[in-house]
Amino acid sequence: MTINYQFGDVDAHGAMIRAQAASLEAEHQAIVRDVLAAGDFWGGAGSVACQEFITQLGRNFQVIYEQANAHGQKVQAAGNNMAQTDSAVGSSWA
């Protein structure tokens, strides 16, 4: 009896998480453009309030990016570890 695991699916899922993390930069920049376009709400695009909001937004996106990227790396590592263990166990039964 053969059991087939799809370790490639686990790796692909980890890669997808990491790609989504990387795409956050484009979303971040789009939000910053919108904030600057609505600068009057903040008292002008160059105002302290506007710049502080953009700074805080950048920090928040950085935390999200780092956590998502790290999670994707962990998922990929787990898939790789499972594949190696499965291969080692499988070859020991041969």
Curated annotation (Swiss-Prot):
Alphabetized UniProt keyword annotations? Secreted
- Source organism superkingdom: Bacteria
Q: Give its localization.
A: Secreted
**InterPro entries from the entry?**
ESAT-6-like_Myco, ESAT-6-like_sf, T7SS_ESAT-6-like
Tell me the SUPFAM superfamilies matching this sequence: EsxAB dimer-like
| Keyword Transport annotated | no
Gene3D superfamilies from the UniProt entry: ESAT-6-like
Give any Gene Ontology cellular component. Answer: plasma membrane
Query: What Pfam families does its record include?
Result: WXG100
- Which Cys residues form disulphide pairs? none
- Please state which protein family the record places this protein in: Belongs to the WXG100 family. ESAT-6 subfamily.
| The protein, known as | ESAT-6-like protein EsxN
Which species expresses this protein natively?
A: Mycobacterium tuberculosis (strain ATCC 25618 / H37Rv)
